Amino acid sequence: MSLGGKVYYAPRLYPQNYPKYFKWMEQFFKDHPEYEIVHSHIDAMSYLPLKAAKKAGIPIRIAHSHNTSIDRDFKYLLKQYYRCKLTSVLTHEFSCGKVAGDFLFRNDKFTLIPNAVDAKKFYYDESIRNDVRMKLGISSQTFVMGHIGRISYSKNHRFLIEIFKEFHAIKNNSVLLIIGTGDMEEEIKNYAKKSGIDDDIKFLGNRNDIEKFYQAFDVLMLPSLFEGVPLVGIEAQFADLPCFFSEKVPTEVAFSDKTNFISLNQSAKEWAREIANVDISHRDSERSILIKADYNIQTAYKILESKYYELFELIQRG
């Protein structure tokens, strides 16, 4: 915002709100003819803002894919419909990764824009690790398994808890920290209670300081059923944190030697054994391989910046 940007709040994107959301978008574009590019990041649901943008005559309309499947919830059929209609309202296709682009657009015309983060914000810091653990009442000797993400079907929290239960049997002095909220939160909390080890599972809700938790974790867990290129996986690698991903997470997320991909066909016990064998004895505060990564915002922003300049030139040429 320091560069002059503004934030506008649209109605929440719930099914009962779709007509209200679309009308709000129509009015917004009417009131703000100065905007010549609309860049939407809500996957199949991008159909709604881009349809309103097309109606308003906005020349550049970008849909940006961040996922490789659609949650099988009550909105599933509607999202599938919007996905099929999306190409009728967009002018350009962007994606965080190849698999995500293939899924949403079903062609090879999309532009790859890597998910990028401010790498320095996540570099490992022993003092932050100790501080976070102290505030949570976790000793320096305790093994901390961490997960950050929306509590929803795609993140596979039931299996995450099963893995932790098996791991806890191997390494009793361990805890699972779950950061995030979502539509399955109560169901997953109840499942954790039934596991018999819920005293060692902590639900921390949404946080605005997640960069500190990568320091406190010993491993990051993403046993997802589907993903785009997950930002949490990128952030964790900048913190030199060992990561365990399911095979459903695109391998393009990996840029450090501490990423591990395990099949969801393997049992929770097999996952637990793999995690128990990981070396957590040393983490670097800064590694040259990470500095050079495409996911570092200091280099990756140039890709998006150059693309925007290219699109503005298209507009000027008419």
Language-model segments: which ranges?
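A charged, aromatic-enriched C-terminal amphipathic alpha-helix characteristic of glycosyltransferases
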Residues: 121, 282-318
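Nucleotide-activated donor-binding/catalytic signature segment of Leloir-type glycosyltransferases, i.e.
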Residues: 188-205
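Aromatic "clamp/platform" in nucleotide-sugar-dependent glycosyltransferases that forms part
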Residues: 206, 225
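A conserved mid-protein helix/loop that constitutes part of the nucleotide-sugar donor-binding site
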Residues: 143, 147-166, 183-189
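Donor nucleotide-sugar binding/catalytic pocket of nucleotide-sugar-dependent glycosyltransferases
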Residues: 8-9, 88-128, 301
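Short His-centered aromatic/hydrophobic patch
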Residues: 40-46, 65
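Acidic anion/phosphate-binding donor-loop and adjacent secondary structure
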Residues: 14-20, 102-107, 116-135, 140-142, ...
